[in-house]
Amino acid sequence: MSQYSQNQSSGAYPTPPVSTGPYVAPPPLGYPTNDTSHATVATVETKSKGDGFLKGCLAAMCCCCVLDACF
């Protein structure tokens, strides 16, 4: 007969802790969070890139109108 009893106390394997909810993965590195312990806010300056896009659109519309009138 074996020396080890099958009815030993469950002290070797304690019950797992009760979870507080589903696991939520942490955000990726560099993702802004609500943690304000290291809040260093850098001011962002915007630069105007000019009105090249507007001029290009107007030129394209004029070109379409001229081609439509010619053909």
From Swiss-Prot:
<protein>
    <recommendedName>
        <fullName>Protein CYSTEINE-RICH TRANSMEMBRANE MODULE 6</fullName>
    </recommendedName>
</protein>
<keyword id="KW-1133">Transmembrane helix</keyword>
<comment type="subunit">
    <text>Homodimer and heterodimers. Interacts with CYSTM7 and WIH1/CYSTM13.</text>
</comment>
<dbReference type="InterPro" id="IPR028144">
    <property type="entry name" value="CYSTM_dom"/>
</dbReference>
<comment type="similarity">
    <text>Belongs to the CYSTM1 family.</text>
</comment>
<keyword id="KW-0963">Cytoplasm</keyword>
<dbReference type="GO" id="GO:0071456">
    <property type="term" value="P:cellular response to hypoxia"/>
</dbReference>
<dbReference type="GO" id="GO:0005737">
    <property type="term" value="C:cytoplasm"/>
</dbReference>
<dbReference type="Pfam" id="PF12734">
    <property type="entry name" value="CYSTM"/>
</dbReference>
<feature type="compositionally biased region" description="Pro residues">
    <location>
        <begin position="14"/>
        <end position="30"/>
    </location>
</feature>
<keyword id="KW-0472">Membrane</keyword>
<dbReference type="GO" id="GO:0042802">
    <property type="term" value="F:identical protein binding"/>
</dbReference>
<comment type="function">
    <text>Involved in resistance to abiotic stress.</text>
</comment>
<feature type="region of interest" description="Disordered">
    <location>
        <begin position="1"/>
        <end position="36"/>
    </location>
</feature>
<feature type="transmembrane region" description="Helical">
    <location>
        <begin position="48"/>
        <end position="64"/>
    </location>
</feature>
<keyword id="KW-1003">Cell membrane</keyword>
<feature type="compositionally biased region" description="Polar residues">
    <location>
        <begin position="1"/>
        <end position="12"/>
    </location>
</feature>
<dbReference type="GO" id="GO:0005886">
    <property type="term" value="C:plasma membrane"/>
</dbReference>
<dbReference type="GO" id="GO:0042803">
    <property type="term" value="F:protein homodimerization activity"/>
</dbReference>
<dbReference type="InterPro" id="IPR044850">
    <property type="entry name" value="WIH1-like"/>
</dbReference>
<keyword id="KW-0812">Transmembrane</keyword>
